Design a protein with these regions (language model features):
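Short, glycine/acidic-enriched capping/hinge loops at junctions between secondary-structure elements
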Residues: 13-15, 54-57, 220, 278
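Membrane helical hairpin/interfacial module
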Residues: 41-59
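Claisen-condensing/thiolase-fold acyl-transfer catalytic domains that form or cleave C-C bonds
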Residues: 21, 25-28, 49-51, 63, ...
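A short, Trp-centered hydrophobic/proline-enriched beta-strand micro-motif
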Residues: 73-75
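Conserved "HGTGT" condensation-loop signature of ketosynthase/thiolase-family condensing enzymes
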Residues: 1-44, 65, 69, 132-239, ...
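Conserved beta-strand-centric core segments of catalytic alpha/beta enzyme folds
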Residues: 1-18, 86-149, 249-284
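Surface-exposed loop/turn positions
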Residues: 41, 70-71, 122, 263
Length: 284
């Protein structure tokens, strides 16, 4: 069995201009409290706003907490980043070669201009073989990969390197064609969640969706076709935090008592790419 020993999120409701590895430092210190950092086997960081092109944000984080025995690498999976990090950490621990792996996500939105609807946030979870009250039962994800032009950063990669003109035109910032694309993706994500749960014979007591805007949240909730009291809604008006989104919502639901004991919880993520992800936990 694989467990989440502790999960802590941080939602800033602003752009902090903090490096990603600094932004997630507080949640990480909270989830490893009382633990020797040398016992951390790995750090997986989901982010598209890492401190440097290289080294990785996870490497920077590992240095700050002195996790000298840990492997470290970053992943990019947009809005489903935290669940993707969980999936990898789960696999490492399930292999029984590793006992403690940090799955973190941190987004610091220096790559946005002010009109974009994003706020800084971070989340950390300690994935472990040590029995805890949150058991990871199931994780799945899928990617379409055909929607590049709808939400991406146009400049800065091999296809379009940095240019003076491009920077003036803000092509190094996140580009979103239309917020309505996420409203439609929310419907598709709800269908994916229902089909995946049905196929695997999983019954859910409580759903925690990622958030982008109120409209996309409502579309997800309505398309899921379950009692609205079974859906965590306290983040529905919050700005998105990309890969940290679902993890922050999960952490808040744990802290505010929305998740009841002896319940089966579905953490749902969706976004650009297009990516969809689902994690199921038993909370005792």
């Amino acid at each position: 069995m694989v467990y989440i020993k502790s999960c802590k999120g941080l939602y800033k409701n602003e752009k902090t201009k903090m490096p990603a590895s600094d932004l997630v430092l507080e949640p990480v210190k909270e989830v490893i409290k009382g633990m020797d950092a040398l016992d951390i086997d790995g750090i997986i960081c989901a982010t598209i706003t890492k401190d440097y092109v290289y080294p990785s944000a996870s490497c920077m984080l590992g240095g700050k907490i002195k996790a000298k025995n840990a492997f470290c690498y970053d992943i990019e999976s947009d809005f489903t980043g935290f669940i993707s990090a969980l999936r990898l950490a789960y696999s490492f621990v399930e292999s029984k070669r590793y006992k403690n792996v940090l799955a973190v996500s941190s987004e610091s939105f220096y790559i946005c201009d002010d009109k974009d609807r994003f706020n800084d946030a971070s989340v950390a979870a300690l994935i472990t073989s040590e029995k805890s009250n949150i058991q990871i039962d199931f994780i799945d994800s899928t990617t379409d990969g055909s929607a590049l032009e709808n939400c991406y950063i146009p400049m800065g990669g091999a296809v379009k390197p940095y240019t003076r003109e491009g920077i003036i035109n803000k092509e190094h910032f996140i580009y979103i064609k239309d917020n309505k694309i996420f409203e439609e993706e929310a419907k598709k994500s709800a269908l994916y969640v229902k089909e995946t749960l049905s196929k695997n014979n999983i019954e859910i007591d409580y759903y925690i969706p990622s958030y982008f805007n109120k409209e996309s949240f409502d579309n997800f909730a309505n398309s899921l076709s379950v009692d609205k009291n079974k859906i965590y809604s306290k983040m529905e008006n919050s700005n998105s935090s990309l890969s940290a989104t679902s993890g922050v919502a999960f952490s808040m639901a744990l802290e505010d008592g929305s998740i009841k004991n002896n319940s089966k919880v579905a953490l749902c993520g969706f976004g650009s790419g297009y990516t969809k992800a689902l994690a199921v936990f038993s909370v005792s």
